[in-house]
């Protein structure tokens, strides 16, 4: 059972995409956390996780993608755009994600979603979190969301819907 928290947990999520023979594919993984989340273990998700103290949003995204897939992020969409400011020891910056997400009940989260590309290598699932990793064409991802929404981790369902609504080939 996942406890409720008094404040939302800040997270990052990565929609990892690649072009293969003119088709856009999205990396999806099987969530595998039976000891920590027996309800949703076995559902499809995208790489995501918490932002560590002192870590920039982009550092967190790179770390989470690497931890869960073994792949290194090579680019972002939209391109990285930031504004920074430092004053009295406070370092801050503004950034533009692809979209944002919020979980309102259960383990409440507020997240920042980025579309990114990774190195051309085979993914290696993190055994403590990920059961399997696959690349799905956007058309197949759209069919999965329409025909079997219960197979998608709920936090990522609206994110993937939004992504597909913005896609030119999904």
Question: Residue spans of the language-model regions?
Answer:
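Aromatic-acidic/polar surface patches that form glycan- and anion
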Residues: 5-7, 50, 54, 107, ...
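Short, cationic motifs built from Arg/Lys/His that form the positively charged side of catalytic pockets
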Residues: 30-31, 63-67, 134
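The catalytic Nudix box helix
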Residues: 46-84
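Structural signal for conserved beta-strand scaffold positions within catalytic alpha/beta enzyme cores
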Residues: 28, 78, 134-137
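Active-site segment of metal-dependent pyrophosphate-handling enzymes
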Residues: 70-120
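N-terminal strand-loop-strand
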Residues: 1-46, 73-74
């Amino acid at each position: 059972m996942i406890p409720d928290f008094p404040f939302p947990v800040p997270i990052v999520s990565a929609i990892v995409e690649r072009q293969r023979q003119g088709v856009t594919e999205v990396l999806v993984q099987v969530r595998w956390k039976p000891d920590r989340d027996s309800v949703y273990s076995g559902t499809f998700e995208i790489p995501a996780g918490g932002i560590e103290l002192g870590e920039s949003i982009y550092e967190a995204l790179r770390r989470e993608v690497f931890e869960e897939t073994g792949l290194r992020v090579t680019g972002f969409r939209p391109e990285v755009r930031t504004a920074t400011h430092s004053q009295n020891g406070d370092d801050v910056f503004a950034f533009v994600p692809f979209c944002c997400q919020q979980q309102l009940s259960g383990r409440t989260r507020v997240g920042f979603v980025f579309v990114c590309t990774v190195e051309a290598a085979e993914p290696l699932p993190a055994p403590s979190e990920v059961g399997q990793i696959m690349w799905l064409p956007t058309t197949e991802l759209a069919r999965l969301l329409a025909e079997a929404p219960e197979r998608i981790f709920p936090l990522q369902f609206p994110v993937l819907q939004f992504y597909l609504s913005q896609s030119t080939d999904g």
